[in-house]
């Protein structure tokens, strides 16, 4: 049975794919990140991705596919997985234009049954994927299942501390309880970056730091590294968050 929250989010991303593609075209990172991986991956992430040439890597919730393109440019054999077929269609066209050999698979990250057990040397997921997913344990459980023994699960997510603030250009004030995991229902506009109301239904989930750690451990991976990085603030975030960590990086190793 299809997950109603994920189906709503799939429809939302299918509908918004053209708008999101326009933003990506304006920034132009997708055109260059296969030549310079640091455009798509932070130094903290690249520390764990130094020697990926020839390795099989799955990117879960690949979205704009900048990470997938960066890893492909580094010589990895990349499989890009996303719930939105429209997002993947955009990525296919871009990969062809860049001459990149990336495999694209449409799937929900909590059901990767189209992918075999112990298939990949490394699984990367992050950016802003987990807030769209209703079951973190199944999500990371599937990620671990497709990992080869001793393979790495790299989770690099938007930091949960940044999700609690009210929208204000000048003040930091808690607007959402840190422990209110949701589902949070929104009627959103076509433009993903801006918070105007619209006709597209979407659901988000606010996972805590402990939720991320617990889900990785439950997946059968050993947690071998944890790190927070970034301290800037972006206009789309709607609050002055400079000085707070931007991202949470967790590294798991699939146990034998």
Q: Each predicted region: which residue ranges?
A:
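N-terminal, positively charged/glycine-rich alpha-helical extensions of SAM-dependent methyltransferases
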Residues: 1-28
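Conserved alpha-helix/loop element of class I SAM-dependent methyltransferases that forms part
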Residues: 25-55
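Class I SAM-dependent methyltransferase SAM/SAH-binding core
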Residues: 56-111
């Amino acid at each position: 049975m299809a997950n109603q929250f994920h189906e709503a989010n799939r429809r939302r991303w299918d509908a918004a794919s053209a708008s999101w593609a326009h933003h990506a075209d304006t920034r132009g990172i997708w055109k260059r990140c296969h030549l310079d991986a640091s455009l798509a991956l932070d130094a903290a992430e690249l520390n764990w991705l130094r020697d990926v040439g020839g390795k099989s890597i799955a990117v879960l919730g690949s979205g704009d596919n900048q990470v997938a393109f960066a890893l492909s440019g580094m010589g990895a054999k990349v499989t890009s997985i996303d719930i939105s077929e429209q997002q993947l269609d955009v990525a296919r066209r871009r990969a062809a234009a860049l001459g990149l050999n990336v495999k694209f698979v449409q799937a929900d990250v909590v059901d990767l049954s189209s992918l075999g057990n112990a298939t990949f040397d490394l699984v990367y997921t992050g950016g802003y994927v987990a807030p769209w997913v209703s079951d973190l344990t199944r999500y990371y459980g599937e990620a671990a299942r497709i990992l080869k023994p001793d393979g790495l699960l790299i989770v690099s997510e938007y930091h949960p501390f940044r999700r609690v603030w009210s929208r204000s250009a000048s003040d930091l004030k808690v607007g959402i309880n840190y422990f209110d995991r949701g589902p949070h229902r929104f009627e959103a506009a076509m433009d993903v970056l801006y918070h105007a109301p619209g006709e597209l239904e979407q659901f988000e989930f606010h996972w805590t730091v402990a939720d991320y750690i617990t889900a990785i451990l439950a997946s059968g991976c050993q947690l071998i590294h944890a790190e927070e990085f970034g301290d800037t603030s972006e206009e789309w975030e709607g609050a002055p968050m400079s000085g707070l960590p931007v991202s949470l990086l967790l590294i798991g190793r699939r146990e034998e």
